[in-house]
Curated annotation (Swiss-Prot):
Residues where Mg(2+) 1 binds: E232, E268, D296, D339
Source species, domain of life: Bacteria
Gene3D superfamilies referenced in this protein's UniProt entry, alphabetically: Divalent-metal-dependent TIM barrel enzymes
Compartment(s): Cytoplasm
Name of the featured protein: Xylose isomerase
Organism per entry: Cronobacter sakazakii (strain ATCC BAA-894) (Enterobacter sakazakii)
Amino acid sequence: MPTYFDQLERVRYEGPKTTNLLAFRHYNPDELVAGKRMEDHLRFAACYWHTFCWNGSDMFGVGAFERPWQQAGDALSLAKRKADVAFEFFHKLNVPYYCFHDVDVSPEGASLKEYLNNFAQMVEVLAQKQQESGVKLLWGTANCFTHPRYGAGAATNPDPEVFSWAATQVVTAMNATHQLGGENYVLWGGREGYETLLNTDLRQEREQLGRFMQMVVEHKHKTGFRGTLLIEPKPQEPTKHQYDYDAATVYGFLKQFGLEKEIKLNIEANHATLAGHSFHHEIASAIALGLFGSVDANRGDPQLGWDTDQFPNSVEENALVMYEILKAGGFTTGGLNFDAKVRRQSTDKYDLFYGHIGAMDTMALSLKVAAKMLEEGELDKRVARRYAGWNGELGQQILKGQMTLAELAQYAEQHNLAPQHQSGHQEQLENLVNYYLFDK
């Protein structure tokens, strides 16, 4: 079979001084960082949708890319050709994982019967590709937002028949993920929200969404799927407001429906931007809430109000993200999936490699900076000193519920408390982080 990327054998590590733009400068899969191989820390994945499904179209222009599998022809044959190219790409890029939506890998067809038949055939193709290449599935998911039937949502749709169709897609995609050895299953509610409150029953839709998630959890346990269920927060787009706005919002939703022990979060950098948060904030929040699962590594443009899905290129931003992840013990079933796409003007097929190589080097360098910060512990020491009072007798009595509000007021009066503000040393801490970032 002829290869698509015929000018490249494989992307390899050549070190910081290489001038080869199709080589890694910082990502060395076998390099030990904090006692673990870099590949095992980062758990990179390439996504099917942006890389092989997007044709370069946007709101103002038609497709700009010439991809052989996007031409007219038999849909199933073209899907198999796309799989050939995808796994050639995964292998040559040297990523251990990939991710997909159901209709990324398989044509939806004109009926539910066609959808099920096509997807079943393509799961067999993917299983064979995985066996041949050694590339594994980080997570699968179902696209319940693109088809016109989902104009008013899937789980939150006012029509229970649409809800049922979505359930069919999700159960089928979950089963496929299980069959393919996927380590997680992602739920992203692209249209689980509203565009106007004039035709929306918020309580009804929230109850529907909660029941849908409960059924997903029930199915997971019934089938014996041992992977992690993940919700991916996003505040808006394509709807005006989504119910999974950010990490904190999802936590409240999960608590309401008794799911906080069953579902974790897949945090995307660009979605944090849209929610008015930093990527660092959303990662730290997910960890603090006990919900951290996986990451969609990309970046947004703070000057634009939509999901640009650019490749991550800031070590300054991602070093702090990796610091939080390492401090929390690192990934378990999750990883760093590049939910990112080349720009519409990047029409050379090798631009797909340039985008991913730069992103992988960025995250590798971020990992090394984070590991050094964690090893030396200077940031942790300063934070610990700031909260040291809570380890004392008074702090512990408060936290353990041994004092009431009135007793605290009495304590303050009896001891004539006159606490003085202590500096937060923000500038010092920012300088400290820069020391690790730019230490040569």
